[in-house]
Amino acid sequence: MPYLLRVELPDVPGSLGRLASAIGEAGGDIEAIEIVEKRLGGTAVDDVLLETIPGTMPDSIVSACNGLDGVRVVWISRYAAGGNLFLDLEAVEALTDAPDQALDRLVEVLPITFRADWAVRLHRVTGSGAGTENAPGNLEFCDLEAPSRLEFSEDDDNLYAGARISGNEIVVIGRRGGPEFLDSELARLGHLVSLAVSIATV
């Protein structure tokens, strides 16, 4: 069973090695690690994609990680995206492969790129547009000047982030239950949306 683990750890040599050893001893097999954010206080936030051996409970992996000095598990969840981390460069490639479909492709790749559950385009007048499976159909358009975390009053289960496509259209991505979208992820979202817009208008 693939899991995605988001962990905060000291940004010092040897930290990843200790983390990998703890995960392995608890019954997890690491398939990929991606640095999500480096923080000023000397810590880093990493996403770890791992497989568990049969019979291993995710709680045991969380406990093993939290038992390390300076390490804190932010979030763990089953990861349904085919067991592959989809990096930003692959997202860019998907956008440039079909410039006339760049905005639709953007919606398709955002959930995988950001470990989100869904993505949807919202228009000021017509409401929900292109969206992935499980995207809610009742979200309302909101004006955005910069990529931002969003809140919708009717839903407490999802965490949202959005970015402006144009004055009349935005894209929103959502995660059920977490983790929270980090500032570095908002910046990446803004860059990818801007790139998709520029590709679509060439």
Residue ranges of predicted features:
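Hydrophobic, well-ordered secondary-structure segments
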Residues: L89, L103-V107, L186
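Amphipathic alpha-helical "output/dimerization" segments
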Residues: F181-V197
